Amino acid sequence: TPDSFSDGGKFNTKKKSFLQIKKMINSGASIIDIGGESTRPGSKTINPKIEWKRLSGVVKNFKTKFKKISLSVDTRKLEIMRKSLNYKVDLINDVSGFSYDKNSMSFIKKSNAAKVLHHMIGTPNSMQNNPRYNNVLLDIYDYFEKNLKKIGSMNVLVDPGIGFGK
């Protein structure tokens, strides 16, 4: 993304993305996580069409180029999750904890893809604006306990969201 916190938009073309992916794989990466919408603090939500346009070149071609490497798509939007899974994406990483779209939790629960259940209060745009916890560790633990019951605990990674309002 043009406003990415990880690379500052250096790999925002299909060609540059694949060159960086090859470099990461050659360095030992076995999972590649890509996103078309920045989730850095203060970032704004973008239209799903723009997000898919940014992702689709990699998502549509990844498995033909890198059969043994897992592809993770970082998105909050159900539409992007669906499209990505049509191209055999291995993992969906949602910083909203599958709560941005009211139907994403039930959708992803039915999917065989691995999932990253993330903790964040608010949105990327607001998460740093005075987040409140009774006890940060217990609050996060309770969040995961509650949401793992909803999503199921098979094929789920949990991400406490360090830097996302903590």
Label each PLM-derived region with a short phrase.
Residues 11-34, 64-67, 82-91, 99-113, ...:
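Alpha/beta enzyme core
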Residues 44-73, 79-83, 110-116, 120:
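Alpha-helix-loop-beta-strand connector modules within alpha/beta enzyme cores
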Residues 71-72, 91-94:
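Short catalytic-loop micro-motif centered on adjacent basic/acidic residues
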Residues 129-166:
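Catalytic alpha/beta core domains of metabolic enzymes, predominantly
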Residues 1-19, 44, 70-72, 128-138, ...:
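Active-site mouth loops of central-metabolism enzymes
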Residues 41, 81, 101-102, 125:
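Generic structural signal for helix capping and beta-alpha/helix-loop junctions
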Residues 1-3, 37-39, 76-78, 95-98, ...:
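Active-site beta-loop-alpha junctions enriched in small/polar residues
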Residues 5-6, 30-58, 162-166:
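Glycine-rich, proline-tolerant flexible connector loops at the mouths of alpha/beta enzymes
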